[in-house]
UniProtKB/Swiss-Prot annotation:
Positions with biased composition (Polar residues): 168-178
Major site of localization recorded for this protein: nucleus
Family: Belongs to the ELL/occludin family.
Taxonomic lineage of the native organism: Eukaryota, Metazoa, Chordata, Craniata, Vertebrata
GO CC aspect terms: cell junction; chromosome; cytosol; nuclear speck; nucleolus; nucleoplasm; nucleus; transcription elongation factor complex
Organism, scientific name: Homo sapiens (Human)
Coiled-coil spans in chain: none
Task of the protein: Enhancer-binding elongation factor that specifically binds enhancers in embryonic stem cells (ES cells), marks them, and is required for their future activation during stem cell specification. Does not only bind to enhancer regions of active genes, but also marks the enhancers that are in a poised or inactive state in ES cells and is required for establishing proper RNA polymerase II occupancy at developmentally regulated genes in a cohesin-dependent manner.
Descriptive protein name: RNA polymerase II elongation factor ELL3
Any one GO BP annotation for this protein: stem cell proliferation
Annotated tissue distribution: Testis specific.
Keywords linked to the UniProt accession: Nucleus, Transcription, Transcription regulation
Quaternary structure annotation from Swiss-Prot or TrEMBL: Interacts with AFF4. Component of the super elongation complex (SEC), at least composed of EAF1, EAF2, CDK9, MLLT3/AF9, AFF (AFF1 or AFF4), the P-TEFb complex and ELL (ELL, ELL2 or ELL3). Component of the little elongation complex (LEC), at least composed of ELL (ELL, ELL2 or ELL3), ZC3H8, ICE1 and ICE2.
Superkingdom of the organism of origin: Eukaryota
Length: 397
């Protein structure tokens, strides 16, 4: 994806007419964000927007409530060599023929999604729950839920970007204008041709797909069975906790303290290695005592069965812990790029605190599952190494 030529700065405002110093964006948002914008329009309050590169946050304040949303700005995909995406409006006139007006080309796309619960919404919209889509960790990374194929079904509006010195222009803007749907209609006009044979992005083959591919190849049956066995029992994905440091989690002292107290298994510094004293039995992981070198095919089969049992649990924990860890790593990296004391820093700080509080309530067993996931990763790696070592010896003999 191409980089935007220059960063967007200024005040975000809904508009349906051309004006000087404006940029047209394709706005895509879910139902929760749309309801929040409508409530903000009804309350006649000024939204606050903070850009950080091509990402940012949108705060919709109100009397006694506040909503915080995340957004990302990207290039609009153009179909064909000369394809373009234009914003066209139709004016319905009482007298005379209706007219079409091209407001301009849509080069950037701004995707907004509900990122968290903030302060409870006013009673007029409590029944709709402004951030209903953000109650589960699976919805935190929601950008992938929008694609070019569903562009027509998503609400689309023209956005006016007024150049000002402060990216958080909360005092120089105007309130959201009234709804213009009864006066205008908008369409996406895709010029040039449509690519009919576009292939979807292919993911890495799974174990089942590899089995099917192996069966189709003209290889000996023994080789096929060996490959099926290998993919079924020995595919170990990397741990999601590798490279995770306490500095990546900017908020949550309890979380950080818990990480500091974790036992760094199988990691020995030079000072420890130089120590002549041997480690006590309680310091040695149980799987090192239980799983020794393999000397028979029966022992190998037993190890593989244990591997399959623990691997099923590891896959579940890996998905849960990895999603949660990655979210706070990204937030920590974003706040590091902002200078402390600025409005952007305050917006990010509030977002991290609120998301962490909500995360602790929704996922109280995170620490235990994180430890268990790390333990299983080390255990499965150990068993896998023993099996490969035994097979290598047999292959050589």
């Amino acid at each position: 994806m191409e980089e935007l030529q220059e960063p967007l700065r200024g005040q975000l405002r809904l508009c349906f007419t051309q004006a000087a110093r404006t940029s047209l964006l394709l706005l895509r948002l879910n139902d929760a964000a749309l309801r929040a914008l409508q409530e903000c329009q009804r309350q006649q309050v000024r939204p606050v927007i903070a850009f950080q590169g091509h990402r940012g946050y949108l705060r919709l304040p109100g009397p006694g409530w506040s909503c915080l949303f995340s957004f990302i700005v990207s290039q609009c995909c153009q179909e064909g060599a000369g394809g373009s995406l234009d914003l066209v409006c139709q004016r319905f006139l009482r007298s005379g023929p209706n007219s079409l007006h091209c407001l301009g080309s849509l080069r950037e796309r701004l995707i907004i999604w509900a990122a968290m619960d903030s302060i409870p919404a006013p009673s007029s919209v409590q029944g709709h729950n402004l951030t209903e889509d953000a109650r589960h960790p699976e919805s935190w990374q929601n950008t992938g839920g929008y694609s070019e194929g569903d562009a027509v079904s998503q609400p689309q509006m023209a956005l006016e970007e007024v150049s000002v010195s402060d990216p958080l222009a909360s005092n120089q803007g105007q309130s959201l204008p009234g709804s213009s749907r009864e006066h205008m209609a908008q369409w996406e006009v895709r010029s040039q041709t449509h690519v009919p044979n576009r292939e979807p992005v292919q993911a890495l083959p799974s174990s089942a797909s590899r089995k099917r591919l192996d069966k189709k190849r003209s290889v000996p049956v023994a080789t096929v069975e060996l490959e099926e066995k290998r993919f079924r029992t020995l595919p170990l994905v990397p741990s999601p906790l590798q490279g995770l440091t306490n500095q990546d989690l900017q908020e949550g002292e309890d979380w950080e303290q818990e990480d500091e107290d974790m036992d760094p298994r199988l990691e020995h510094s030079s000072s420890v290695q130089e120590d002549s004293e041997s480690p006590s039995p309680e310091d040695i992981p149980d799987y090192l005592l239980q799983y020794r070198a393999i000397h028979s095919a029966e022992q190998q089969h037993a190890y593989e069965q244990d591997f399959e049992t623990d691997y099923a649990e590891y896959r579940i924990l890996h998905a849960r812990v990895g999603t949660a860890s990655q979210r706070f790593i990204e937030l920590g990296a974003e706040i590091k790029r902002v200078r402390r004391g600025t409005p952007e820093y305050k917006v990010l700080e509030d977002k991290i605190i609120q998301e962490y509080k909500k995360f602790r309530k929704q996922y109280p067993s995170y620490r235990e599952e994180k430890r268990r996931c790390e333990y299983l990763h080390q255990k499965l790696s150990h068993i896998k190494g023993l099996i490969l070592e035994f097979e290598e010896k047999n292959r050589g003999s």
